Amino acid sequence: MSIPENAIAVVGMAGRFPGAKDVSAFWSNLRRGKESIVTLSEQELRDAGVSDKTLADPAYVRRAPLLDGIDEFDAGFFGFPPLAAQVLDPQHRLFLQCAWHALEDAGADPARFDGSIGVYGTSSPSGYLLHNLLSHRDPNAVLAEGLNFDQFSLFLQNDKDFLATRISHAFNLRGPSIAVQTACSSSLVAVHLACLSLLSGECDMALAGGSSLCIPHRVGYFTSPGSMVSAVGHCRPFDVRADGTVFGSGVGLVVLKPLAAAIDAGDRIHAVIRGSAINNDGSAKMGYAAPNPAAQADVIAEAHAVSGIDSSTVSYVECHGTGTPLGDPIEIQGLRAAFEVSQTSRSAPCVLGSVKSNIGHLEVAAGIAGLIKTILCLKNKALPATLHYTSPNPELRLDQSPFVVQSKYGPWECDGVRRAGVSSFGVGGTNAHVVLEEAPAEASEVSAHAEPAGPQVILLSAQTAAALGESRTALAAALETQDGPRLSDVAYTLARRRKHNVTMAAVVHDREHAATVLRAAEHDNVFVGEAAHDGEHGDRADAAPTSDRVVFLFPGQGAQHVGMAKGLYDTEPVFAQHFDTCAAGFRDETGIDLHAEVFDGTATDLERIDRSQPALFTVEYALAKLVDTFGVRAGAYIGYSTGEYIAATLAGVFDLQTAIKTVSLRARLMHESPPGAMVAVALGPDDVTQYLPPEVELSAVNDPGNCVVAGPKDQIRALRQRLTEAGIPVRRVRATHAFHTSAMDPMLGQFQEFLSRQQLRPPRTPLLSNLTGSWMSDQQVVDPASWTRQISSPIRFADELDVVLAAPSRILVEVGPGGSLTGSAMRHPKWSTTHRTVRLMRHPLQDVDDRDTFLRALGELWSAGVEVDWTPRRPAVPHLVSLPGYPFARQRHWVEPNHTVWAQAPGANNGSPAGTADGSTAATVDAARNGESQTEVTLQRIWSQCLGVSSVDRNANFFDLGGDSLMAISIAMAAANEGLTITPQDLYEYPTLASLTAAVDASFASSGLAKPPEAQANPAVPPNVTYFLDRGLRDTGRCRVPLILRLDPKIGLPDIRAVLTAVVNHHDALRLHLVGNDGIWEQHIAAPAEFTGLSNRSVPNGVAAGSPEERAAVLGILAELLEDQTDPNAPLAAVHIAAAHGGPHYLCLAIHAMVTDDSSRQILATDIVTAFGQRLAGEEITLEPVSTGWREWSLRCAALATHPAALDTRSYWIENSTKATLWLADALPNAHTAHPPRADELTKLSSTLSVEQTSELDDGRRRFRRSIQTILLAALGRTIAQTVGEGVVAVELEGEGRSVLRPDVDLRRTVGWFTTYYPVPLACATGLGALAQLDAVHNTLKSVPHYGIGYGLLRYVYAPTGRVLGAQRTPDIHFRYAGVIPELPSGDAPVQFDSDMTLPVREPIPGMGHAIELRVYRFGGSLHLDWWYDTRRIPAATAEALERTFPLALSALIQEAIAAEHTEHDDSEIVGEPEAGALVDLSSMDAG
């Protein structure tokens, strides 16, 4: 076939025209002679804002060519935030969507196209900008004070200059990108310029077209005598009644390539552009807007000359044809002049037509509409009618020309090649003419080759699940048509010629089957990518996994079966080629004909080792080579027994010939070994040992609960009987020998001697070892002894799985018969829903086609995100076919016009983004008061307004949300208006809301405005005290903890006062009271002085000393005294005496929780007892010194907050604060309640474990080397999972804050509240093994830095991080393990600490804003649990279920862990616990 040198192929096209949603509907309307200019009802016009005065005007024409859906756009598909989409000119939006459909029609994926792609486009002036956007502001002020950024941004999104470059940016096109503006001829000029660019080599493919919208849209127009618009609302080109045109809306594009390149690429060619030309009228005409017939004739003649054709061969001309009395005669005059230069007589007249009679004048898109119409005429070999043509305008003098007007639909009769001209003339004089020719016969005809036999893989892509569903339905409909495309061509077009995002693969057999599968909601032959289920926009390019996720598994002995892979051998030449190569090698080594053995042999023969191992090697090697041709690569290999040799060969350890020799020798020597038997047992390796006779050995561990044992046949038979009687599942393994046991020892020397003479190389792909269960080192791989030991050693397949499944989202591909290895993987404890298995071959019992199974596997891999090269599936004669385009989401993005007031347009408001809603500042203040960061709230609001979304995920990337450099400028300007200093560059460095907030706050903190805490006379409160006060949840006066001592009645008040004076003066925290001012708290510490604050109450008369009644009376007095402490400004420590009659008195120190912790109570008890001893002995009271007092500690907190050790933990706390996925308040019926509970809204449930159950807990601690806290938290996770649901719950823990970050701070003897509070994520799951659950909690706690000290410092002292952490939700659960409460000491000492008396009143009621507070402590040898719950948030039934389930879950956890006990923990992980003899010493507790 001769290819014209300058010919350009139209390989793709798309458009939306009045009354037509796509090109197919457009042709249907043309063929039926449908006019798409409609009459508008009075109500429609009123709704559009047309006034009654206008409606009454006789000059107002109520007609318009309407385009549906101009307000709709799939913003997510193109990466536009909602607000940006709303402001973007709809002409640009439609052009974007049509450009994508045109590329799809061309079978061109820009990301895979090997060359540059240019864009030549045009749009009309933006009526949307003028009528809609700018109607919201004072037009006199738009530019009154000069251009500002937001005006520039607004014009940038609406001006016609940016149409083409917007396409290039959206699709990452690197060729020329030119906006063309020549008025009505613009889009045809764009086609001409694109052709020149292709011919000059500037680009290899080009998009060309135009977009024009009349806005306001659903309105008519005014006419007047002599105007160019029709008074009747009909466009009647060439007709005697022609009185003007009707302007309408539309968009169209074509995709162009050099004809030779299109043919070479196998493109579908719609038509050929033989040549084109443009020129201008100049001034030789009646006026600027008037046409020039001579210039029009010149441009047509030049186009003919460029095309190298004679005008007599042009049988149709799509005219500019506006239907105006002036324009039509001039156009025919020019045509006559151009065509009369021909020296060849015509055999038939040239037909004229004008699409404007159907759809009106589309302004800048008029030329592309005419071009697409003409291309459709060429494709269909038919000419539609030019509507409303009854008799010619006599001014045309058609009877004196070679032209006739097509007045009805009919075939395009032509003696030779069909050729056509398309004209478009612009106001201002730029004329364009294009010569079209029908596509070459070879390119236009569907291949005559028969449909290839066998299954096909259909691939579909979409960015949302909804779009995928629409695509499936549309493709099914296309396949169901009578003249639908060949299935192989559909598969080729979708696989090789479409861009893929979220994916779906379907294996189908014919068109009918394909349609059925596509329409089915679920089908075994359909595989859908995970992202397509969630309905969110996503891009495969961003989420596509690498080959590192893929692991190939090669099965061994026992997987073989007769006929395996026969279907692949018969249908896949690559498989057959490699099978034949291996079979020939094994025949030379062994004399065995594998073709006969594998495809036609018997099962008994194939079970022989000397046959099965070569057969498996051959099949699996050929299968691996076949899958390799599809581009599927693995990041690692695991081979099972014989399979390890296949893996090593593919990894390059053995060359193929060496591998064949090695496997042949190994199989022969194994076959010659003593016979034996093997069975698979449903027990773990430790449990099965007790059942094994002496000569039966462990052969393989496939998963922790299943293993294989082997030995002599008689002993295996007896073992099977014993296991069956014990109710333990056992099954025979198809093996004739006791593989991987000492029974193989006799062959080892000969095998190792052979291997030592072979050359082994380090692997190109990582290998896992059967011998060690871990990665093979290069040294191990090349060591013959390792390969020899593998023969007689158990296969540690479970350990190999343990290694690969530790990584998330692994895809395990079984490269061999059946699915035994992937089945073991799915039973492994580390298997999760993020992992996937794929089997390349069928199970022997499945009656399915081998190739069907293989293609299903490829489809499943592809849908999982693995790159698959579908080239091997390309038909012998591939043919690109037309298929439905992407179903864009029809979402409205529109700003309605405002005809009454001037306000600010969205996205254009005098220098800042869309205006702040009333009350936003108040909302910010409220948010700040609720503990949220004011900076973040402000930035959240700015981002939301600029992006046009209601909320912004604080960890979402600004640019992933659709942000760009211009929007970054908008955000910086809006932030400046809020008093925040941000540069556009900051958005690149800190692209998330969280990171930007931290950066802004850090900048503020470094500005030097903060007053150093050391300069303050009264120090600010430390972070944990701030935690208490910041929430404002409890009456600070009531939150007191008692410290109770029994005193001998002979101890008098002077002694008590002396002791108290010494102790209170020794510890400054006991002289503390807080002063609050507008939410800012200071600590005031009184000077040392004699202690006078002592109250005295007596037990009522008649109560016997030492009786239970006396103790109850004392407790009542103490509880009453504690309740009386309601003055928030009073000192935080008070002392009371409860005097008994004749028995001991009780001294109660009521100390506020904010100045004492468990260690403080121990220090105070020791000091008081010491002081009493010294006083009663007549000695001076001298207490052990305090190194760092409370006041000094408080002053140092600010410095500690900026200590590197604290700052280094920022990322840890920020990351961990967002891990929770389960919130009790959300998972349970009651809504989340932000306000703190009152005392009467809290309820306590208590339970006690028996001494025996508590001992069991101690035994578990010693066995597993895990702390009591770890075991209790693991049980709590199980309890929540069983009663509420599975997920990750945020739990607040308490830590010991006395281990500080600076060596010059010593708090070991300091009285004060140093408890740290910090959140940890707790996984709540029911399916996790006990040891795994303990390990998970242990690792979580072990990762907590510095006992959680840094969290409080960063949360309450270091402002930048404080705002970030403060925005996080309060954990639902507070958990505290208080350790051992010592029992009442015996003896007659005059002063004794009374823990037994303290216990009932020692803790204040909770109220820190948690839904549940669980307090656990040891007392009297038993474990006690107090469940406090907020009755507004937690139903009583749920709380009772938690309280009831916890002991059961704890016991089950310990029992399970003991059953699966292991001792692999490092000694460094042994953790201590508070034990008897210490009140509570949290500093002795490790983190996990």
Curated annotation (Swiss-Prot):
The active site is at C184, H320, H361, S641. Residues 5-438 form the Ketosynthase family 3 (KS3) domain. Keywords: Acetylation, Fatty acid metabolism, Lipid metabolism, Multifunctional enzyme, NADP, Oxidoreductase, Phosphopantetheine, Phosphoprotein, Transferase. Binds 1 phosphopantetheine covalently. Pathway: Lipid metabolism; fatty acid biosynthesis. Its EC number is 2.3.1.292. The modification O-(pantetheine 4'-phosphoryl)serine is found at S965. Residues 551-868 are annotated as: Acyltransferase. It catalyses: icosanoyl-[(phenol)carboxyphthiodiolenone synthase] + 2 (S)-methylmalonyl-CoA + 3 malonyl-CoA + 5 NADPH + 10 H(+) = C32-carboxyphthiodiolenone-[(phenol)carboxyphthiodiolenone synthase] + 5 CO2 + 5 NADP(+) + 5 CoA + 2 H2O; docosanoyl-[(phenol)carboxyphthiodiolenone synthase] + 2 (S)-methylmalonyl-CoA + 3 malonyl-CoA + 5 NADPH + 10 H(+) = C34-carboxyphthiodiolenone-[(phenol)carboxyphthiodiolenone synthase] + 5 CO2 + 5 NADP(+) + 5 CoA + 2 H2O; 17-(4-hydroxyphenyl)heptadecanoyl-[(phenol)carboxyphthiodiolenone synthase] + 2 (S)-methylmalonyl-CoA + 3 malonyl-CoA + 5 NADPH + 10 H(+) = C35-(phenol)carboxyphthiodiolenone-[(phenol)carboxyphthiodiolenone synthase] + 5 CO2 + 5 NADP(+) + 5 CoA + 2 H2O; 19-(4-hydroxyphenyl)nonadecanoyl-[(phenol)carboxyphthiodiolenone synthase] + 2 (S)-methylmalonyl-CoA + 3 malonyl-CoA + 5 NADPH + 10 H(+) = C37-(phenol)carboxyphthiodiolenone-[(phenol)carboxyphthiodiolenone synthase] + 5 CO2 + 5 NADP(+) + 5 CoA + 2 H2O. PANTHER family: FATTY ACID SYNTHASE (PTHR43775), SI:DKEY-61P9.11 (PTHR43775:SF37). Was identified as a high-confidence drug target. This is Phenolphthiocerol/phthiocerol polyketide synthase subunit E. It comes from Mycobacterium tuberculosis (strain ATCC 25618 / H37Rv). The gene is ppsE.
